[in-house]
């Protein structure tokens, strides 16, 4: 179905949604229509049905008339490309355009912008794909943690301006569907033809080009982008602000939904970047004690560097026993799973993958009536799963224990927009030091393959790619 040029009007029927001046008819679960060619027209009977008083005029209008588009030179665009199990490479890739492709058709994306990528981070979720634990196809451009400068804007972008430095939520969202309007931007219904929810450079998340690159296109820019209020201030704190696209909101979401508040005792499973971000977020929320569990001593040392207690999950002592040694109690108020489906066993089983381990442990160590946050990634299709059940996301959970203890659980993607503005203000006004907490380590785009390899070996670092040398120049 096409689109037509029409200024916004109040009190039109509920079936009509506005896409920055492009009037879009709703009715199916497909991605929103993209501006059609000038020859496309709405059928007269459909126009008459929805706009009986104005249908003669509307039906004669062409859809989305063509305008000249200013292009920005990006002939040196490069990106991190997944080549197959364990392999990534930095390769030349196509320049981004203000276009969307759907079912073989390419149309203009007037609501989008093109960003010069200032920083883009390697995420543990990327590692799941690189390890071959998803159905990601070779040739995919990776990267969903993006901060950049606007260098080109579509004609329907009203509030984001050229030169703005912006954080890009990893969730791609339309801003118009029910989920977006209710704040659940992680499961937008209009940006992925196969399932709710989309992300840049991630398997099964809509086919959007990733942002571990020099330039990237962002749709629905006025809705999706968080523009930093002051350019110089943003560049001075860019190592912290780059964490707003994913891991800081994701860690905060895990702690917040678990119920962390003033005086809480908290257990965080996993001392990777998301776990460390969650621990720091728990401190920001007022937790009295934050305990972080992991098997890599370097990562545990990083957690201790900003005031966390730690437990080594390679030891034979039970997790409740280790928590009791710290708190004098075997249970905490809140627990957060920041590990996900590649979890390993405890103690003697620490070298064996047991994907339900963390979920069962957090239920065990959370007090009656407590809360559990689960930002750790779980999938429905794992080619490398330990058994047939795990390969389809079916795990052996002690759900009866969770029920008996009246625990509340929150799972799923973090809706980044729910938290990123507040966390930005906390960064800009020196209320937190997220880059220090996660040990942000800047490397060049060309060094991304080595960053992936080091991260896979358990490095206690959050690798931040610097495609244009902006971060190196500001250090």
Q: What is each stretch, according to the model?
A:
Residues 275-276:
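N-terminal Rossmann-fold NAD(P) dinucleotide-binding loop
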Residues 288-291:
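Short beta-strand element of Class I
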Residues 94, 98-121, 130-181, 186, ...:
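Glycine-rich beta-strand-centered segment in the early N-terminal region that forms part
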Residues 294:
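Conserved acidic E/D residue at the C-terminus of a beta-strand in Rossmann-like folds
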Residues 258-260, 285, 301, 306-407, ...:
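Glycine-rich cofactor phosphate-binding loops and adjacent beta1-alpha1 units
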Residues 14-69:
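Low-complexity proline/serine/threonine-rich segments in eukaryotic and viral proteins
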Residues 2, 7-8, 69-75, 106, ...:
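C-terminal hydrophobic helical "lid"/dimerization subdomain
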